[in-house]
Structures are given as structure tokens and as C-alpha cells.
């Protein structure tokens, strides 16, 4: 596997190709597409004529990854302030806030970087780490440029708030503002993207002064303004007074002794679940002890099993989940779980503007259901439908099953590659066939994951309906209301983007898509069947032959053009 200087050269080539492409698009747009084609075909021909097949694949993939990362980082020029009467809100800025982000990122990646420097060059893990560093480095660059460029404008006449930075441009109608709160300082453990999951937060904090938190449909905005109390008073006029918290919410620094447990839990999540630093250090330690590849493989599998066992605690820490204190929700959950024949299931809530609920834990005795704060605002019968759906996931051990099925597929792929290594002595003679095989493995993995996941979702919908007083009708109505709320938030978020222009995104997940291609994606690659299908089958089939119908419709909707 190419490493060191050679792989760094291919990274630079990927970046260079994007710069040439961007320059061509600006100077000679009529032929910029063909310039891209010539560059990539020429690069592929050169690489495969000078490197072995697998080294060529790795090198070309590295170039592609750097190309797309550069495309994400280099954006077109944005309008700093829209036309009209706007007042700039002065932001509090200091270097410490940005240095804290950089430090936490370095800590999370430390194990991976150590392995990349000292680990064996032949290890495929080095390539995985390299891609992770490219992605993480790109995200960090975006964060740095956002901090230096962010500006906030307010218009009393238009009743709007405008956010402008190098990568983020939003215009918010203040009529959409749900509530506004002040926090004593920036909560890094809540805002840093490597330490969270399923987050809809837009972190534009630029100091450790008081943070103004604005909740809007589908997203929450965090800013550090110089006069937070003044701007809270102004913006509070646009919200429902009942939803606002008058006092300043106390936030402890991430290094505070009372935050140590929370910090360690999030770092463990970042290093073991969201990243590979922990696995990298484990493999490096065994490599230093001259352990055999089989010992390394067994150790990695055992650590993976340990992480599955600890998944409930790890994810609870990552999501800052707290025990649910809504008596009506807890009472409904207890009733549903008794009907499902399961016990010791805890209900937690996490702060998020996404309408979502998830089952967590690898076995019934250590399971929990986490509901977002947005979900808890839904009608009671909708929450009951979500709880019933998650109860079936827990009863059928779907979280554990999905992990084992994924591991089974990856194990089969590794076995096939080992057979190839034994029986194909000259892979260069079968480049086209091997390339096609690798592409097939990637596509089949997506199909396989989607098939298993959708089967579990269909089962959870229909068996979950039997746990509800309203049966299939209540489950269908719960999914319908959930879909409507999700669609509304997506459309709002699209409208906030200044780049959306007049062609505002229209979302209706309860209507069958007219496009064959999007139906193919929905049924063959998405983790859930389309919502219109789920609601329709609950009302029409009522649990009878629904899995057969799903198999039939999965094929039919994927090949029918109309």
C-alpha cells in the first residue's frame, strides 16, 4: 500500500485537479467538464500502468477524496449583507474559543495520528486514518474560517436576522423563533461536532462569554454577542413568552471537575465509536509486542464486542441524554413495554430540534429509548406510536442484530479477499474484473444494509401497532404527523438558506415520488421505506402479509417507470 511521500503526492494531485477544474469553470466554462474527464482518465491510466492494482485503487481513491474535500472547502463568493436597512450585531471574539476546538480535535485524533506515524506501512488502517484526517481537517478548516468571517445582522423593519460567514449564510424570519435563552458560556461538550451525534446545532460561537441560544424549526443557533442581555430582550419580543427561560443557564467549563465524567464519556465515544483512535492504539500496542495477525484480529473483535455491551452508556453520554421527567410519557411507556413483554427499559430525552426517537442497547436488560426534545412536543398519541415502534426494536434485539449482520457481511468480504490472495497470483492481469468486483461489493453492502434495516422497520411498525389502543390506525396517524412535522422543518431550513432563491425546496414524504430514480433510492438504499408506503400499508394491510407486500413493492417500485 502506498504510504508516506507517495500518498501525500496523490493528495496534492487531488487538490490540484480541483483547482484546475475550478479555474477552467471560471475561464472556459464551455469545456470545463471535458477537462475534468481528460485529467481523471489520464491520471487513472498513469497510475494503473505504474502501480499494482490495489495500490492504484488506493491512490486514485485518495485523489478523489481530496478532490471532493477541496470542493467542499472552496465556496463561491457570498453576499455579506442583503439589501435593506440592517443593523450589525457586534460579536465577542477571542482566540481561546478557537484554540479549544483545535485542542479537542487534536485529542480525539491523537491515537490515530500516533498509529499513522509509528504503525506498519502495510496496515490498511493507515489508509482509513488518512481519510479520517482529511475529513476532520476539512471540518476544522471550515470552523476556523467561520469564526473569522461570521457576521450577524438584524432588521427591525423586515423582522429578520441574517447570518453571514465563509460557509454559512442564513436569513431567519423572526416570526419562526421558538424561544431564546442565555447560557453562561459556550458548552464545548455539546457543541463540538466530534463529541455529539444527531445534532442540529449551528455553532457560531466565537468566545467563552455568554451565549445566546436561538431555537428555530429544525435547528438551534448559538452566538456570542457583546451585549447578550440587550439582544435577548429585543429578540424575545418575537417569541412566545411562556417558552422563554429568564435566568441565565449555568454551563461549567469542559475541564471542570464536575464535568470530568461527561468529558471522558464523550472522548471515549469520539475515539471508539465516531473514530478509530482507540482501535488504532490497541493494534499499535499489539504490533509493538509482535503479536500475530490472528491475535490482533481477536483483540479488535473483543474490543468491538465490549463497545457493543457499553453502547447504552456511551450513546447516552454522547447525546447528553437525561431521564425523562414527563409523567404522561413515562406512564405511556410503562404500559406499552408491559404489553410488549419487556422490562427494565428506561426513557431518556436529549436536546434536539429533530423529530426522532431511537432504541439504544444491545440486549433487553440494558436497553433504553431516547426521545428528542422536539419529539416530546408532539401529541400524546404520536409519542405513543413512536414508543411502540421502538419497543419492538428492543424486543427483537434489532440494535444487536443490525451490528451482527453488518459484521457478517464484512467478514464474508474479508474471507473472499483472502481467497483471492491465495488463488490469484497476478491481480494485474484481472484489473477490470477486480475493479468491477470492488464496486459491486460497495453497492451490495448498501443494498444489504438497506434490506436488513427496512425489514426491521416494517416489522416494528406493524408489531408496534398491536401494542397501541388505537392499533394500526393510531400508528399510521403517528407516522403521518411525524412526517408532516419533519417535512415542515426541512422546508423551513431550505428557506433560511440565502442560496435557495426563488426555487424553494418542496418536500412531501407522504406522496409517492413520480421519479423512478428516487423511488429506487428510497426502496433499495435508504434505511427506512418511504413514509407514504409505511402509512399506506398500515391502513390497508393491517399487519396481514405486510412483509410479502414489502418484498413485492420493493422490487416493483424500483423498476416501474411510472
Curated annotation (Swiss-Prot):
It is a multi-pass membrane protein. Its cofactor is Zn(2+). GO terms for biological process: proteolysis. GO terms for cellular component: plasma membrane. InterPro entries: HtpX_protease, Peptidase_M48, PH_YxkI. Residues 1-24 form the signal peptide. The keyword Kinase does not apply. Its main location: membrane. The lineage of its organism: Bacteria, Bacillati, Bacillota, Bacilli, Bacillales. Keywords: Cell membrane, Hydrolase, Membrane, Metal-binding, Metalloprotease, Protease, Signal, Transmembrane, Transmembrane helix, Zinc. The active site is at residue 390. It is found in: Cell membrane. The keyword Nucleotide-binding does not apply. Belongs to the peptidase M48 family. CDD domains: M56_like. Its EC number is 3.4.24.-. This is Putative membrane metalloprotease YxkI. Binds 1 zinc ion per subunit. GO terms for molecular function: metal ion binding; metalloendopeptidase activity. The chain crosses the membrane at residues 33-53, 56-76, 98-118, 128-148, 267-289, 294-311, 400-420, 432-452. It comes from the Bacteria. Disulfide bonds: none annotated. Zn(2+) binds at residues 389, 393, 457.
Amino acid at each position: 500500500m502506498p504510504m508516506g511521500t507517495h500518498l501525500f503526492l496523490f493528495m496534492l494531485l487531488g487538490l490540484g485537479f480541483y483547482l484546475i477544474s475550478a479555474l477552467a469553470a471560471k475561464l472556459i466554462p464551455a469545456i470545463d467538464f471535458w477537462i475534468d474527464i481528460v485529467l481523471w482518465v489520464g491520471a487513472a491510466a498513469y497510475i494503473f500502468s505504474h502501480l499494482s492494482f490495489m495500490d492504484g485503487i488506493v491512490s486514485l481513491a485518495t485523489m478523489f477524496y481530496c478532490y471532493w474535500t477541496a470542493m467542499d472547502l472552496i465556496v463561491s463568493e457570498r453576499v455579506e449583507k442583503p439589501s435593506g436597512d440592517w443593523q450589525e450585531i457586534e460579536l465577542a471574539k477571542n482566540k481561546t474559543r478557537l484554540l479549544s476546538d483545535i485542542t479537542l480535535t487534536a485529542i480525539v485524533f491523537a491515537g490515530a495520528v500516533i498509529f499513522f506515524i509509528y504503525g506498519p506501512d502495510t496496515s490498511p488502517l493507515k489508509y482509513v486514518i488518512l481519510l479520517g484526517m482529511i475529513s476532520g481537517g476539512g471540518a476544522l478548516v471550515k470552523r476556523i474560517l467561520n469564526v473569522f468571517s461570521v457576521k450577524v445582522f438584524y432588521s427591525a423593519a423586515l423582522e429578520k436576522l441574517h447570518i453571514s460567514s465563509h460557509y454559512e449564510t442564513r436569513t431567519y424570519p423572526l416570526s419562526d423563533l421558538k424561544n431564546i435563552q442565555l447560557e453562561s458560556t459556550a458548552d464545548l461538550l455539546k457543541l463540538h461536532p466530534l463529541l455529539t451525534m444527531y445534532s442540529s446545532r449551528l455553532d457560531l460561537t466565537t468566545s467563552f462569554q455568554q451565549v445566546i441560544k436561538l431555537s428555530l424549526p429544525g435547528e438551534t443557533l448559538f452566538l456570542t454577542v457583546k451585549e447578550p442581555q440587550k439582544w435577548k430582550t429585543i429578540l424575545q419580543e418575537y417569541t412566545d413568552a411562556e417558552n422563554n427561560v429568564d435566568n441565565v443557564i449555568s454551563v461549567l467549563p469542559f475541564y471542570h471537575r464536575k464535568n470530568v465524567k461527561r468529558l471522558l464519556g464523550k472522548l471515549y465515544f469520539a475515539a471508539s465509536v465516531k473514530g478509530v483512535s482507540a482501535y488504532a492504539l490497541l493494534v499499535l500496542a499489539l504490533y509493538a509486542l509482535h503479536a500475530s495477525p490472528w491475535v490482533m484480529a481477536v483483540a479488535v473483535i473483543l474490543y468491538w464486542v465490549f463497545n457493543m455491551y457499553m453502547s447504552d452508556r456511551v450513546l447516552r453520554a454522547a447525546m447528553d441524554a437525561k431521564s425523562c421527567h414527563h409523567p404522561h410519557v413515562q406512564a405511556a411507556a410503562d404500559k406499552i413495554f408491559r404489553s410488549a413483554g419487556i422490562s427494565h427499559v428506561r426513557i431518556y430525552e436529549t436536546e434536539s430540534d429533530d423529530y426522532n426517537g431511537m432504541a439504544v442497547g444491545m440486549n433487553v436488560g440494558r436497553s433504553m429509548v431516547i426521545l428528542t426534545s422536539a419529539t416530546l412536543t408532539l401529541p400524546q398519541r404520536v409519542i405513543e406510536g413512536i414508543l411502540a415502534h421502538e419497543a419492538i426494536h428492543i424486543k427483537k434485539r434489532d440494535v444487536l442484530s443490525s451490528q451482527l449482520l453488518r459484521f457478517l457481511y464484512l467478514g464474508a468480504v474479508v474471507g473472499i479477499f483472502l481467497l483471492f490472495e491465495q488463488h490469484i497470483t497476478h491481480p494485474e492481469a484481472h484489473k477490470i474484473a477486480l475493479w468491477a468486483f470492488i464496486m459491486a461489493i460497495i453497492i451490495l453492502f448498501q443494498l444489504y444494509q438497506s434490506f436488513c434495516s427496512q425489514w426491521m422497520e416494517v416489522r416494528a411498525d406493524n408489531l408496534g401497532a398491536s401494542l397501541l389502543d388505537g392499533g394500526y390506525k393510531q400508528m399510521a396517524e403517528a407516522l403521518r404527523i411525524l412526517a408532516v412535522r419533519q417535512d415542515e422543518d426541512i422546508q423551513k431550513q431550505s428557506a433560511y438558506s440565502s442560496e435557495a432563491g426563488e426555487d424553494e425546496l418542496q418536500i412531501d414524504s407522504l406522496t409517492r415520488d413520480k421519479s423512478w430514480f428516487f423511488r429506487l433510492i428510497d426502496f433499495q438504499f435508504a434505511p427506512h421505506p418511504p413514509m407514504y408506503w409505511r402509512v399506506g400499508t398500515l391502513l390497508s394491510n393491517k399487519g396481514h402479509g405486510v412483509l410479502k407486500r414489502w418484498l413485492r413493492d420493493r422490487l416493483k417500485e424500483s423498476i416501474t417507470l411510472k
